[in-house]
Amino acid sequence: MEVILLDKVNKLGGIGDVAVVKPGYARNFLIPNKKAVMATKANLASFEERRVELEAQAAERKAAAEARALTLEGKTFTIAANAGDEGKLFGSIGTRDIADAISTQVAVEKAEIRLPEGAIRHTGSFEVDVQLHSEVIVTVTLEVIAE
C-alpha cells in the first residue's frame, strides 16, 4: 500500500515521501496518528498545496524538541527504590518511573524514554536515552539508590 508521509517516520522517509508499507501498518498506525495519507492523485495534489505548512510545523516541533533537549543535557536524576542487600531491586524501574522523575523538571512522555536493555533491576548509575523527536535524542544519567 502506498502512502504519502506527512511527518518524518524512522526507517520510512521524510515529509512528502511516497512509501510502500504493509496495509495494516498504514491503517492501524500511520493514518490514525496523522503521519500519512493514502497515495491517491487527489491526496498528492492537496499535499503539494500544504507542503510548506507541514514543513513549517515539522521544523517548529523539532525546534521545541531541541529546546527541551538543552534543558535535559547533562542532567542527573535520582530514583529511590526498595532494594536488597546486594543492590537487587524488589521490582523494577521502567519507562513510566523514569518519565515521572524527569517530568519534575521537563515535560517528558513515557513513550520518549528508551531502555534498549529493558527495565532497570539493580541500583547504580545508568545512561538513559530520551528521544524527544525522531532527530533529537539526549542522554541523561539516572541514579538508582536503595530506599
UniProtKB/Swiss-Prot annotation:
GO biological process: translation
Coiled coil: none
Record's keyword annotation contains Ribonucleoprotein: yes
GO cellular component, one term: ribonucleoprotein complex
Disulphides: none
MF terms in GO: rRNA binding; structural constituent of ribosome
Entry keywords, A to Z: Ribonucleoprotein, Ribosomal protein, RNA-binding, rRNA-binding
Homology family: Belongs to the bacterial ribosomal protein bL9 family.
HAMAP family documented for this protein: Ribosomal_bL9 (MF_00503)
Stated role: Binds to the 23S rRNA.
PANTHER family to which the protein is assigned, alphabetical: 50S RIBOSOMAL PROTEIN L9
Protein name: Large ribosomal subunit protein bL9
UniProt organism field: Marinomonas sp. (strain MWYL1)
Gene: rplI
